[in-house]
A protein has these predicted regions:
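Extreme N-terminal starter segment of soluble prokaryotic enzymes
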Residues: 1-4
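Short N-terminal binding/cap micro-motifs at the start of the first secondary-structure element
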Residues: 11-16, 42
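Helix N-cap/beta->alpha junction signal
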Residues: 8-10, 138
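Glycine-rich phosphate- or other oxyanion-binding loops that anchor nucleotides, phosphorylated ligands
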Residues: 24-204
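Short, aromatic/basic amphipathic alpha-helical patches
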Residues: 15-25
Length: 204
C-alpha cells in the first residue's frame, strides 16, 4: 500500500519530507508527497488528480497547521487528530473512521475562507474538551478520501489563536510566520506516527 503524505504548501511538504526521512523507518514503505495548496477547491482538485493516476490502494496522511479558539485549554503546537470534520457553512458534521490513532482526537471545523473569529452556529456543537480547531481543508480531504474509500488520517498542528497571532498589525491582513510553521512540524514524532500506520497497514 502506498502512503500519501499531503500538506498545504511546498514549505510544509519540504519540512515534513526532511523529518520523515530522518525517522529512518526500516520497513519497505512506499511514500509519496503531495502539495495540495491552501483552500478547499485546490485540495479537492489536487487529491483527485493524484488518486486518478493509481490503481493500487493508498493510505492518505494529511498533516497541516490549523487555527484554534480555546486559548485557555490548548497547549500550543501539540498536534491533534481530527475525529470529526464540521462544515461551518452547512453545519453538517462527518465522523472520520478511526483507521489508526496517532494523536489526541478532536473536532475540526472547516471553512471556505480564512476565519477571523469563532463562527456563530445555529446548531449546538459539543467539542471534545471544549477545544475548537479551524482550517479550510480537512472537510474536503475527508470528502475525497471517503468517495474513493481510502483509509486516511487528518493530523492538525495548532499554530495560531484565531486571527490574533498571525495577523499583520499594519495592513490587517492574515500572514503566516513560516519559521513558526517549520518549528511546529520539526517537533512531530514522525517515527511513532509511521510505526502506527505501518501496524495498521500490516493488520489488513
Amino acid at each position: 500500500m502506498k502512503l500519501l503524505v499531503t500538506a498545504a504548501t511546498p514549505a510544509e511538504i519540504n519540512a515534513i519530507k526532511k523529518w520523515i526521512k530522518a525517522a529512518n523507518i526500516k520497513k519497505n514503505l512506499d511514500i509519496d508527497y503531495l502539495c495540495c495548496w491552501i483552500g478547499n477547491y485546490e485540495t479537492i482538485l489536487n487529491l483527485e488528480n493524484y488518486i486518478s493516476k493509481y490503481s493500487e490502494p493508498i493510505f492518505i496522511r494529511n498533516i497541516w497547521i490549523c487555527g484554534y479558539w480555546n486559548h485557555e485549554n490548548q497547549k500550543k503546537n501539540i498536534p491533534i487528530q481530527a475525529a470529526t470534520t464540521f462544515n461551518i457553512h452547512t453545519e453538517k458534521e462527518f465522523v472520520i473512521p478511526p483507521f489508526a490513532q496517532i494523536a489526541p482526537m478532536r473536532n475540526c471545523f472547516s471553512s471556505e475562507k480564512p476565519i477571523k473569529e469563532k463562527p456563530y452556529l445555529k446548531k449546538e456543537i459539543e467539542c471534545i474538551n471544549d477545544e475548537w480547531y479551524f482550517d479550510m481543508e480537512s472537510r474536503w480531504t475527508e470528502f475525497v478520501s471517503l468517495k474513493h474509500k481510502l483509509p486516511h488520517i487528518i493530523l492538525k498542528v495548532p499554530l495560531d489563536f484565531v486571527w490574533q497571532e498571525t495577523i499583520d498589525l499594519y495592513d490587517n491582513k492574515w500572514k503566516f510566520i513560516w519559521k513558526d510553521v517549520a518549528d511546529c512540524l520539526e517537533k512531530l514524532p514522525y517515527h511513532d506516527y509511521l510505526q502506527k500506520i505501518i501496524e495498521w497497514i500490516e493488520s489488513q
